[in-house]
Every structure is written in C-alpha cells, then in structure tokens.
C-alpha cells in the first residue's frame, strides 16, 4: 500500500512538472502601449518600400530624414525632425494609403518565443462611401527600445 502511495505521489509530481513547463513555452504576445506620431509635415516625403522603417538610433533617423526632406515648400530648408530619445525608444513606420472613410486599426505586439515585435495595420476600405482621394501615411509609432536580439516585422492587411 505504501508503495502505491509513493508511486501515485511521484506520478503527480511528474504531471505537475510537465504541465508547468508547457505553460512556459506558450507564446506570450502582449500588446505594447505605444505613441502614434503624425507624419512629419510637408517638408518630409517618405517614399517607402513595403519593408517599412525600423529606426533605432539618432544617426539613422537624421540620415533617413535628410534623404526624404524636400525643399520645394517655403521654410523647408530650416525645418528639423522632431526630437526622439533613441536610448529609450525605437521608431517604426510603414506606408499605407487610405481614403477618409476607411477604417484603420494599428497595434504592436511582442512575440517573446520567436523574439519579434510585430506592427500590424488593418485597413477596411469603404469604396462605395467615399471618393477615391487617397491619403498616404507612414503610420509612425514610437515604442520602447527594441532589444538587440529581437527582430521587427510589419503586417499590413486591407479588406473591402
């Protein structure tokens, strides 16, 4: 009888140990609290590829700003990019086009298992409600500094 109790106790400990380990391996995908930024005004035109921008240093920020600054508007020669503390933050951006009636939702999640930040933008087009005047946006978002070992991905989906 004592042997059976010991055997059942060991089985219980093994089951608890295994079930606890499974919980630790599940993907944790918290949504971050982020700051969405407006586009940087008429003096900066970011002609972006589908890959998006991941800006994590002031030198890269200034370089990209310089490459995308236009000079054909009044006062653009003296305008500067907003100040961002890249020791604490990373700036993400990807270009989308929407009309004034489209619905847009954005979020940034962290997948701790694959070590990846994912910036998701969902667009629902309501073509029948609006003229087709397109508003182009870079969807800038400021997030806490992305750790070195993490990657960043962008997911943009559009539905009618």
Predicted regions, residues:
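Bacterial Sec-dependent N-terminal signal peptides
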Residues: 1-28
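Exposed, flexible binding/inhibitory loops of compact, secreted disulfide-stabilized domains
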Residues: 20-160
């Amino acid at each position: 009888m004592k042997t059976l109790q010991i055997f059942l106790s060991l089985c219980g400990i093994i089951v608890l140990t295994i079930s606890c380990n499974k919980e630790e391996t599940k993907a944790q995908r918290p949504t971050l609290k982020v700051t969405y930024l407006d586009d940087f005004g008429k003096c900066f035109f970011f002609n972006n590829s589908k890959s998006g921008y991941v800006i994590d240093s002031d030198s890269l920020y200034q370089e990209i700003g310089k490459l995308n600054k236009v000079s054909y508007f009044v006062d653009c020669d003296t305008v500067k990019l907003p100040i961002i503390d890249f020791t604490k933050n990373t700036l993400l951006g990807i270009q989308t086009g929407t009309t004034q009636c489209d619905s847009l939702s954005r979020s940034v999640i962290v997948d701790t298992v694959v070590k990846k930040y994912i910036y998701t933008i969902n667009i629902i087009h309501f073509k029948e409600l609006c003229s087709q005047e397109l508003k182009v946006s870079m969807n800038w978002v400021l997030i806490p500094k992305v750790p070195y070992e993490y990657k960043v991905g962008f997911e943009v989906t559009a539905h009618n």
